[in-house]
Amino acid sequence: MASVNIKPLEDKILVQANEAETTTASGLVIPDTAKEKPQEGTVVAVGPGRWDEDGEKRIPLDVAEGDTVIYSKYGGTEIKYNGEEYLILSARDVLAVVSK
């Protein structure tokens, strides 16, 4: 995973999606047009967290750089940076962290 010069704001995270499956369990090749959008990726960068209701301290996020996460299917904004595709998600769009 390469270093990226993108720093998310507040409770946003930058995720690089894992590759979608190209073949089925039975060996059938899935064309690009039929592939499901991946819902799993690696966290590349994390924002500092949003402010609490009083605006006095930041609420830390539950994810960290390097975590593998599962996120909402239609959550986030897709971006392309230096030829790589990323997704900027709100921390609320992250459904789970995958244990290694």
Swiss-Prot record:
Pfam families in the record: Cpn10 (PF00166)
GO MF annotation: an example: metal ion binding
The entry's keywords: Chaperone, Cytoplasm
This protein's GO CC annotations: cytoplasm
GO BP, sorted A to Z: chaperone cofactor-dependent protein refolding
Main location: cytoplasm
Source organism, top-level taxon: Bacteria
InterPro entries: Chaperonin_GroES (IPR020818), Chaperonin_GroES_sf (IPR037124), Chaprnonin_Cpn10_CS (IPR018369), GroES-like_sf (IPR011032)
Compartmental location: Cytoplasm
Similarity section: Belongs to the GroES chaperonin family.
Function noted in UniProt: Together with the chaperonin GroEL, plays an essential role in assisting protein folding. The GroEL-GroES system forms a nano-cage that allows encapsulation of the non-native substrate proteins and provides a physical environment optimized to promote and accelerate protein folding. GroES binds to the apical surface of the GroEL ring, thereby capping the opening of the GroEL channel.
Subunit structure: Heptamer of 7 subunits arranged in a ring. Interacts with the chaperonin GroEL.
The protein's name: Co-chaperonin GroES
Species per Swiss-Prot/TrEMBL record: Mycolicibacterium smegmatis (strain ATCC 700084 / mc(2)155) (Mycobacterium smegmatis)
